Curated annotation (Swiss-Prot), chain B:
Protein name: Codanin-1
Residues carrying N-acetylalanine: 2
Keywords on record: Acetylation, Congenital dyserythropoietic anemia, Cytoplasm, Disease variant, Hereditary hemolytic anemia, Membrane, Nucleus, Phosphoprotein, Transmembrane, Transmembrane helix
Region (Disordered) residue spans: 63-294
């Protein structure tokens, strides 16, 4: 699951302009049978998000919105049961869920007196039954269930995955008898930055080829693949901040990471794709 | 001066008499009349003798040590002439010694004249001498131009300068200003020259050990204070390019001067000093001249001079002991004379006896002289580190000239344990976040808190970037980080934020640079680093590895300028780049406070009669503790000096004349940033000089030119000079300072006296009240000074330049190999431990006195233990009160608040008002804290003391110790509690109130009571995320679009619902949002089942799900909704127009599943009939195709027509389990 930069690039190369559908995912799995599905999905999702971030603006010009909306209207007039919105999104290379939001906003602007608030839009996307127009509700719903990178369902899955891995990590810590403070406890104590876990007694992780081990004061669980982009963002917003306060620590990218990114070990940020097995705890007889 | 030396050489006076004469103003009674007469006539010159002697020796040796200036700094007065210049030896005139450059045409015939002149000049008041100082350029050119005359005037003793200028006729452009020595009256034109700049050393011999920028080794005579800049600013002048530039300029000019001379004189006495153009002969071709004791030219003369010189050193009449040693080592390791001596005519014995012939006529003479001097200083040598001793003992010249000395050195080496070890610091460690000082409660506002959060991160980001780049060529701190630092400082608006940041800055400073390469980690007052507890084994390996990777580092010659090595550079540059007045002020406050705190630390005093082995162990600890405190103090003081004098330093020349007077008047009004004078006085009185002086020296080393002229600081210098004089190494006796303590003080003071801003004449001017330095008769019998707190490790750590001695010897061994500045590495200290407890500041009154007295005769560990216990128990007591009394009050507050909320309804009123009400009720209870605290200390302290003291402690001592511990702990705890308990309760209650109010708010689902998984659960259920993802796939397949071959098997659906059940029953991984989505997805799935929209895999005939299968799946769903979901399930979605509309697409429409589902929902009590009726009713309002609307109406009727049989039962259910279905899913 730890990929070299070259391996990662090969996968990323295959993901250029691929729509975020389950069909695409299936093809990807066939193309890289040796990689875990979760890793592939995580990479796919990240790559797609990068792509969307790059192209986001061009879909949000008023001309673009107007043209999409007209195409949508024309489409549903012809056949309301056809996947008009989904096809439109795929055609213009935009995420279906985001396209659904775009059209929904435009629709509500037209049909309501006051411009729709963000929370109303979000609520309607979560539960399309609330959308006043039945055809649009179906179209939106179709976009959402067919989008594997954006949308409320995907967000929920990601959140659940993150939570599950934190629980997993907590269990492992308990199993190893390592006492810790979790995020909630830290927040209650007034910490300004809170990793998932701070070890109350640090441990040393031994590395097979290195003479010395690495001290670990804190552990952060990341249920995603560590690519350059996300890792640098995490370093800046989280990992270094933890280091600045608590000293060296460990990041677990459960879905793997690019090997080359694990370059701050000496500095005190260690990357792993699983819970380390070779841990040495403070031995009281020595101390 | 020369007269004195000559009468000495002629044996008219004895060495002892001369030394007495120098050291004291009056002749001792032991002097015989003849001597007294000979010397008293020269009385006025007394003070000038030592500078003269030092310069004389330097000049005499300049042919042997051709690189000249890098020679250890000369003392006041300028260089003397090279006797053996190629043009012909000096012709019998004394003036020869005053030549710097070879061609000596005009020589002084009367050495006394310049002296007299100088003396006259000196009589003026100190500050006056600053007048007439010259600008930098003048000063530089003065090297060979007229300006040099001025320099002489200003010098404190050497007669030699003037003739040096004369000795170089081509450069003698102004004869009026620079008449021959002796003829120049000390007129106002006697301007002060700049300090002489030493050419960069390029000699082949010294190339490795010579610092390239040995700027502090200029002759003392050049007045530093008259000299602007370059030298002064360069060490920290990153932001002050002018300084650097002028240094360059000076170098350049010197270079030109030299090359001019080279052209003029056939034989270069000094190799051209430029760095870039090596002489052809530089490498390799030189062969060392062997030294032979048999070929020493005039033993007696050399012996005499060596004796006088040694005596001056021993009496601390020279400013810098180690500089002289360095010089002697240079003589010892001199490789060859620059010019061939053979051509010199034989000198007659008469000539040899006087000063007219060169003192050192050959390498043999040099080595002989050096060995003579070293013999007198065996004691100092034997206290050098083991490495230096080894090199000395193995030096073949030493063996050859004095087998006895060599034998003693060898013995000293073999017995030495003074291994100075090299340790690298572990990589940077951040200051840890401590909730007690760093959390929100310590900030005035949320904004300040979050701003500081960001600042901490920016600070470390900057630090890391510096670590990564500062060694890269071309990287510039200001360019790279300056704007970011200033932007960050700009955000520090509140004063409180500044103090937070300064605390972080100071802690990080101590942590990273406490000692140059200190083991880091252990910061004062902080827990020792975990690494050091993990076993010395690993740590040792780690450090050895790092040591190997460590780059060689030169400390910059025997007398380097104050610098900021390593990480210190970061902090200096940070201060400069930040250029924030507020920051500097807060930093000074904080540094001053910490310095006072550490300086006042009650370090255990030496107990001379500790005979058992335990004391040895104790001493290890004491020494370490002392080292930590001392090194921390030095670091803090250095930065305090840097910041405090920063506004007054600049590249421009120091002011003179009236301007200077007005500046002095102004500056003398400014109170010192820290009352160092008082601290020094107290330190001397308490015999803690060994702690106070080293940090004071660091502080003063950053003083600007005006500082030494201020009365306040003059007093300090006077005290330091007296102290210096009193530290006679040979006087060792009971009650005197330990040898290594003295050595440390001599080294740091000697270094200070060489700092350019410290006027060198200060040293020689000082009237020596000298002898016994009895500051105070009531000094304690045993102070820190009498305790062996300094070891070689600490000595070398504080004074890395002492290591230059070793480099010099090593480069002798290794020949000229290696040009990188020496292979010797920087000396860094071993790891040190954290401090023990601090003394309680509360010792007042009789009890306190008694307690003090009690400790006086107990081992120091007892006191430390008691203080430690008191400190910890006191602190724990506060925490205990917090966890018990305060926590109880908070609980009360919470229940009171709940009552309020119930009575006042949802809103609960204004939170601030609520808080006030609660606090007014609860704060009075805080009064109990004192009683509880007292009780706690009483209960806990004795046990702790008992556990920590040795078992054989007498019962009475033990119980006294316990009582004192109880008292101190109680005092500490109660002082804190009485001052803070109300605020503490208030703060905690406030936090509780906001917590409660927040909990009132959103996420009722999350707060709802939830069942955990059963005890037997092994948490093997599928993960919620996996299930959502799977169901989502089914949904997307059902909604389409899909490929023709896509579909799901009925078994898969069944399995999926089974898994869903497992997941819902194992709550381990389930979080509320996931459950909500699962609930919603399950409802969607049910709607698709009802509408028969799920594509089934298999032959086309089977494309649709069998009724039976569909019912079975719906049953499973119903059971999940009923039994397993703990959150609300949005069942009404089953009857949303969109989901019912799915049926519209199927042909033929089948309504039976929907009807079945509705009935089951009612049956299971998941939805009420009325609710369903309402939903069905609203369905009619939607727009449907005609036939569909009809069928829907039929369904409604069918459902409504059913007997209300389960109704009463249902109502019961609803009561038990309030209608879940009606609750809208949050999402």
């Amino acid at each position: 699951m730890i990929l070299t930069k070259a391996q990662y690039d090969e996968i990323a190369q295959c993901l250029v302009s691929v729509p975020p559908t389950r069909q695409s995912l299936r093809k990807l799995k066939q193309r890289f049978p040796s990689q875990s599905q979760a890793t592939l999905l995580s990479i796919f999702s990240q790559e797609y998000q990068k792509h969307i971030k790059r192209t986001h603006a061009k879909h949000h010009t008023s001309e673009a919105i107007e043209s999409y909306y007209q195409r949508y209207l024309n489409g549903v007039v012809k056949n309301g049961a056809a996947p008009v919105l989904l096809d439109l999104a795929n055609e213009v290379d935009y995420a279906p869920s985001l396209m659904a939001r775009l059209i929904l906003e435009r629709f509500l602007q037209e049909h309501e007196e006051t411009p729709p608030s963000k929370s109303i839009i979000n609520s309607m996307l979560r539960d399309p039954s609330q959308i006043p127009d039945g055809v649009l509700a179906n179209q939106v719903y179709q976009c959402i269930v067919n989008d594997c990178c954006y949308g409320p369902l995907v967000d929920c899955i990601k959140h659940a995955i993150g939570h599950e891995h934190e629980v997993l990590l907590r269990d492992l810590l308990l199993e190893k008898n390592l006492s810790f403070l979790d995020e909630d406890q830290l927040r209650a104590k007034g910490y300004d930055k809170t990793p998932d876990f701070i070890l109350q007694v640090p441990v040393v992780m031994l590395c097979p080829l290195a003479v010395e081990g690495h001290i670990i004061h804190w552990i952060e669980s990341k249920a995603s693949f560590g690519d350059e982009c996300s890792h640098h963002a995490y370093l800046h917003d989280q990992f270094w901040s933890y280091w600045n306060r608590f000293g060296p620590g460990l990041v677990i990218y459960w879905y793997g990471f690019i090997q080359e990114l694990d370059c701050n070990r000496e500095r005190g940020i260690l990357l792993k794709a699983c819970f380390p097995t070779n841990i040495v705890t403070l031995c009281h007889s020595i101390a | 001066m020369a007269a004195v030396l000559e009468s000495l050489l002629r044996e008219e006076v004895s060495v002892a008499a001369v030394v007495r004469w120098i050291a004291r103003s009056t002749q001792g009674s032991e002097d015989n009349a003849g001597e007294a007469a000979a010397l008293s006539s020269l009385r006025a010159l007394r003070k000038e003798f030592v500078p003269f002697l030092l310069n004389f020796l330097r000049e005499q040796s300049s042919r042997v040590l051709p690189q000249g200036p890098p020679t250890p700094a000369k003392t006041p007065g300028a260089s003397a002439a090279l006797p053996g210049r190629p043009g012909g030896p000096p012709r019998g005139s004394r003036g020869a010694r005053s030549q710097l450059f070879p061609p000596t045409e005009a020589q002084s015939t009367a050495a006394e004249a310049p002296l007299a002149r100088r003396g006259g000049r000196r009589r003026g008041p100190g500050p006056a001498r600053e007048r007439g100082g010259r600008g930098l350029e003048e000063g530089v050119s003065g090297e060979s131009l007229p300006g040099a005359g001025g320099r002489r005037l200003r010098g404190s003793g050497s007669p030699s300068r003037p003739s040096l200028t004369l000795s170089d006729p081509p450069n003698l452009s102004n004869l009026e200003e620079f008449p021959p020595v002796g003829s120049v009256p000390p007129g106002p034109t006697g301007t002060k020259p700049s300090r002489r700049i030493n050419p960069t050393p390029v000699s082949e011999e010294r190339s490795l050990s010579k610092p390239k920028t040995c700027f502090t080794s200029p002759p003392i005579s050049c007045v530093p204070s008259s000299q602007p800049s370059a030298l002064d600013t360069s060490p920290w002048g990153l932001g002050l390019p002018p300084g650097c530039r002028s240094l360059q300029e000076e170098r350049e000019m010197l270079r030109k001067e030299r090359s001019k001379q080279l052209q003029q004189s056939p034989t270069p006495t000094c190799p051209t000093p430029e760095l870039g153009s090596p002489l052809p002969s530089r490498t390799g071709s030189l062969t060392d001249e062997p030294a032979d004791p048999a070929r020493v030219s005039s033993r007696q003369r050399l012996e005499l001079v060596a004796l006088v010189y040694s005596s001056c050193i021993a009496e601390n009449l020279v400013p810098n002991l180690f500089l002289e040693l360095f010089f002697v080592f240079q003589l010892l390791t001199a490789r060859r004379m620059v010019t061939a001596k053979d051509s010199d005519p034989e000198l007659s014995p008469a000539v040899l006896d006087s000063l007219e012939s060169p003192l050192f006529q050959s390498i043999h003479d040099c080595v002989f002289f050096a060995v003579q001097v070293l013999e007198c200083h065996f004691q100092v040598l034997s206290n050098l580190d083991k490495g230096t001793l080894k090199l000395l003992a193995e030096n073949e010249r030493l063996l050859c000239f004095s087998p006895a000395l060599q034998g003693r050195l060898r013995a000293a080496y073999e017995g030495s344990v003074a291994k100075v070890s090299l340790v690298m610091p572990p990589s940077t460690q951040a200051v840890s976040f401590q909730p007690e000082t760093d959390n929100r409660a310590n900030f005035s506002s949320d904004r300040a808190f979050h701003t500081f959060k960001k600042q901490r991160d920016v600070f470390y980001e900057v630090l890391r970037e510096w670590e990564d780049h500062h060694e890269e060529p071309g990287w510039d701190f200001e360019k790279g980080l300056g704007s970011r630092i200033r932007a960050m400082m700009g955000q520090l608006s509140a004063a409180c934020s500044h103090s937070h940041f300064v605390r972080l800055f100071q802690k990080q400073l101590l942590q990273m640079c406490q000692s140059p390469g200190g083991a880091g980690g252990t910061v004062l007052g902080e827990a020792p680093d975990v690494l050091s507890m993990l076993g010395a084994d690993k740590l040792g390996r780690l450090w050895r590895l790092q040591e190997r990777l460590m780059a060689p580092q030169s400390s910059g010659g025997p007398c380097p300028p104050p610098t900021f090595p390593g990480c210190q550079g970061f902090f200096r540059d940070f201060i400069l780049s930040a250029s924030s007045f507020q920051f500097n002020q807060h930093l000074m406050d904080s540094l001053s406070l910490k310095i006072q705190e550490l300086n006042g630390l009650a370090l255990p005093q030496h107990e001379p009669n500790d005979e058992d082995g335990e004391s040895d162990v104790d001493w290890q600890g004491e020494r370490k503790q002392f080292a930590v405190v001392l090194l921390s103090l030095r670091l803090l003081a250095k930065f305090l000096g840097f910041v405090a004098f920063l506004p007054y330093r600049g590249p421009e020349p120091p002011p003179t004349g009236e301007l200077q007077d007005s500046i002095l008047a102004l500056r003398s009004q400014v109170p010192p940033v820290l009352d160092v004078r008082t601290l020094l006085q107290r330190g001397l009185q308490a015999r803690r000089a060994v702690l106070t002086v080293p940090w004071l020296v660091e502080f003063l080393s950053f003083a600007d030119h005006v500082v030494p002229l201020l009365e306040y600081y003059r007093d300090i210098f006077t005290l330091l000079l007296r102290l210096h004089r009193s530290l006679v190494l040979s006087q060792e006796s009971e009650g005197k300072m330990c040898f290594l303590n003295k050595l440390l003080l001599l080294a740091v003071l000697g270094w200070l006296f060489q700092i350019p801003t410290v006027p060198e004449d200060l040293f020689f001017l000082e009237e020596g009240p000298s002898y016994a330095f009895e500051v105070d008769t009531v000094a304690p019998e045993h102070g820190l000074d009498n305790a062996p707190v300094v070891d070689q490790q600490l000595l070398y750590t504080c004074c890395p330049y002492i290591g230059e001695l070793r480099k010099l010897l090593a480069s002798w061994v290794s020949g000229s190999s290696g040009r990188s500045g020496g292979f010797m590495r920087k000396i860094t200290p071993t790891t040190t431990t954290s401090l023990g407890a601090q003394p309680s500041q509360t010792s007042q009154g009789l009890q306190a006195q008694l307690a003090q007295a009690f400790f006086h005769n107990q081992p120091p560990s007892l006191r430390r233990t008691v203080e430690f216990v008191a400190e910890r128990i006191g602190s724990n007591c506060v925490k205990h009160i917090k966890a018990t009394l305060v926590a109880d009050l908070v609980r009360q507050a919470e229940s009171l608040l709940q009552e309020q909320l119930v009575t006042q309804g949802e809103e609960g009123g204004d939170p601030a008002q609520l808080l006030e009400i609660l606090c007014s009720q609860l704060c009075p209870h805080g009064a109990q804290a004192l009683a509880l605290g007292r009780e706690f200390c009483q209960r806990k302290s004795p046990g702790a003391v008992r556990a920590l003291l040795p078992e054989e402690t007498p019962a009475a001592v033990l119980s006294s110790a316990e009582n004192i511990a109880v008292g101190l702990a109680t005092e500490k705890a109660c002082a804190w509690l009485s001052a803070n308990i109300t605020a503490l309760i208030r703060r905690e209650v406030k936090a509780a109130v906001s917590r409660t109010l927040r909990a009132q708010g959103p996420e009722p689902a999350a707060r709802g009571e939830r069942r955990g998984c059963s005890r037997a659960c092994e948490h093997h259920a599928p993960l919620p995320s996996h299930l959502i993802s799977e169901i989502k796939d089914v949904l997307s397949l059902a909604v389409g679009p899909r490929d023709p071959d896509e579909g799901v098997s009925p078994e898969h659906l069944e399995q999926l619902l089974g898994q869903l059940g497992q997941t819902l029953r194992c709550r381990q991984f389930l979080c509320p949002p996931a459950e909500q989505h699962l609930a919603k997805c399950s409802v969607e799935l049910a709607s698709l089942l009802v509408a028969d929209q799920i594509p089934i895999l298999g032959p086309p005939a089977q494309y649709r799900l069998e009724r039976g299968q569909a019912r079975r799946l719906l049953h499973m769903l119903l059971s999940l909704w009923k039994e397993d979901f703990q959150g609300p399930v949005p069942l009404q979605l089953l009857l949303s127009p969109r989901n019912v509309g799915l049926l519209a697409d199927t042909r033929p429409r089948e309504w039976d599943l929907l009807l079945f589902l509705l009935r089951e929902l009612v049956e299971k009590g998941l939805m009420g009939r009325m609710e369903i009726e309402a939903c069905l009713g609203s369905l009619h309002q939607a727009q449907w195709p005609g036939d569909f609307a009809e069928e829907l109406a039929t369904l409604s009727n069918l459902f409504l027509a059913e007997p209300h049989l389960p109704e009463p039962q249902l109502r019961a259910c609803e009561l038990v389990q309030p209608n879940r279905g009606t609750v809208l899913a949050q999402s």
